Amino acid sequence: MDSAVPLFQMEGISKRYGGVRALEKAELVVTSGSIHAILGENGAGKSTLIKVMAGVVAPDEGRMTLDGREVTFLSPAAANQAGIVCIFQELSLVPDLSVADNIVISDPPKRFGMIDRKAQRRVAEEALARAGAADIHPLALVKDLPLSRRQMVEIAKALARKPRILILDEATSALTAADVSKIFGVLKRLRSEGLALLYISHRMNEIAELADQCTVFRNGRNVASYKAGSKSDNEVVELMIGREYSHIFPAKPAAVPATAAPRLEARKLSWTDRLHDISLTVRAGEVVGLGGLDGQGQRELLLAFFGVLRGLSGEVLIDGKPVAIGSPAKARQDGIGMALIPEDRKTEGLMLPMTVRENLSFAALDRLSKGGIIDRAAEQRLIDDMVGLLAIKTAGLDIPVGALSGGNQQKVVIAKWLMRQPRIILLNDPTRGIDVGTKQELYQLMRKLADAGAAILFYSTDYDELIGCCDRVLVLYDGALKRELVGSEITERALIASALNIHGEESPVGLGASA
């Protein structure tokens, strides 16, 4: 092959879904031995672009070439055979199968017509090692692994297919910092081996560290291509959103007085070996963050408040009164008024085959029904209000919610719960895998809800979010609450030191303490 010929090229690629333009005359050039970042808001066309590349959907027009020869991929298997492998944002693993089973699922090694288990394990071990995840046992069941480790298995599964072009769609969004570092090393090594990598991420620091070339998409078109590092973050964001970029976080109000009545409290809350004597307070009008390294009990704490966990000890109080929240149904009742925005919108927050309308109404059906009959007029008014409030972009309310972009799906999850007018809102890493424009909208919404009197408890793996959004941050370490940071104390340095439990004397934390 002539070295001047790109490894892969897309020219004039267009794709529409009904009346929605997903791609319009899109162009892309991919070269061997490089990492090419694809940037853009959710709904900009990135996902459709890689689905066309990966043989998941067929373009309406345009052409693709591989090694200078025109190609058409009628299925993912055809793209895989040509050496194009995609790791999509939402995991494709089978939870009840082993790691090894998942890694070789598309082409298991066989002997005498039967799966060769010894060869399967060898292939899995080699793929895991290549992915920097040799510590994952190939015989472990995927369902027993935390989300971050499942993502590593997904990457190993892709590498087992020996790709020439590896596409990663938000592949680090569920990873711990240690795993991200490992993956960066793997990707750089793959680049040095001559692989072409397409990297889709909303994390600008990752793009700066990894990418050689960047292409920005907006409204289905590629609006700019440039050498990585040649533009500032603000310039890139302005290209993505098509307008001047202003400060992403809303202004914080004056601190809620420490004497204000608490809305949500925990007293010596414990659960198995994951939570240890947690005591905290969230007042109406506050945005309180949960910090610390990933996996230190933050998610379990949110699930405990929402009535998901069994065998808790300690007390939960609402408006100063002890309550027994034994189920999510009890948590969302009017006297409590709690909502939980889950970490994984696809599996925990939405019913993908059902319509946007059905998903929006689901959490509020008891409020919209009388005698078992839904008040359709009231339902429509509420839905219209939510679609307007969150600026949900959809071709219609009666299309499957799975057809929406990731950012708009997340807006539907949030809108679904806002239809109940919750008094307490728990958010579990709600901006994972969504674009900077949608993030900005969610930050503004969070503050607006707090200003209207909601009490918000917000877990994020992004330190910038904790600094920019929160009035207070409670840092967890090994299931225990180690430090409370307030106002100007909430800095990256303090968050990191507290997360590592190296800050020296612990600040007092507990029933409304202000460290």
From Swiss-Prot:
<feature type="domain" description="ABC transporter 2">
    <location>
        <begin position="256"/>
        <end position="503"/>
    </location>
</feature>
<dbReference type="InterPro" id="IPR003593">
    <property type="entry name" value="AAA+_ATPase"/>
</dbReference>
<keyword id="KW-0762">Sugar transport</keyword>
<feature type="domain" description="ABC transporter 1">
    <location>
        <begin position="8"/>
        <end position="244"/>
    </location>
</feature>
<protein>
    <recommendedName>
        <fullName>Ribose import ATP-binding protein RbsA 1</fullName>
        <ecNumber>7.5.2.7</ecNumber>
    </recommendedName>
</protein>
<comment type="function">
    <text>Part of the ABC transporter complex RbsABC involved in ribose import. Responsible for energy coupling to the transport system.</text>
</comment>
<keyword id="KW-1278">Translocase</keyword>
<keyword id="KW-0997">Cell inner membrane</keyword>
<dbReference type="InterPro" id="IPR017871">
    <property type="entry name" value="ABC_transporter-like_CS"/>
</dbReference>
<keyword id="KW-0067">ATP-binding</keyword>
<keyword id="KW-0547">Nucleotide-binding</keyword>
<dbReference type="InterPro" id="IPR027417">
    <property type="entry name" value="P-loop_NTPase"/>
</dbReference>
<comment type="similarity">
    <text>Belongs to the ABC transporter superfamily. Ribose importer (TC 3.A.1.2.1) family.</text>
</comment>
<keyword id="KW-1003">Cell membrane</keyword>
<dbReference type="InterPro" id="IPR050107">
    <property type="entry name" value="ABC_carbohydrate_import_ATPase"/>
</dbReference>
<feature type="binding site">
    <location>
        <begin position="40"/>
        <end position="47"/>
    </location>
    <ligand>
        <name>ATP</name>
    </ligand>
</feature>
<dbReference type="InterPro" id="IPR003439">
    <property type="entry name" value="ABC_transporter-like_ATP-bd"/>
</dbReference>
<comment type="subunit">
    <text>The complex is composed of an ATP-binding protein (RbsA), two transmembrane proteins (RbsC) and a solute-binding protein (RbsB).</text>
</comment>
<dbReference type="GO" id="GO:0005886">
    <property type="term" value="C:plasma membrane"/>
</dbReference>
<keyword id="KW-0813">Transport</keyword>
<keyword id="KW-0472">Membrane</keyword>
<dbReference type="GO" id="GO:0015611">
    <property type="term" value="F:ABC-type D-ribose transporter activity"/>
</dbReference>
<keyword id="KW-0677">Repeat</keyword>
<dbReference type="Pfam" id="PF00005">
    <property type="entry name" value="ABC_tran"/>
</dbReference>
<dbReference type="GO" id="GO:0016887">
    <property type="term" value="F:ATP hydrolysis activity"/>
</dbReference>
<dbReference type="GO" id="GO:0005524">
    <property type="term" value="F:ATP binding"/>
</dbReference>
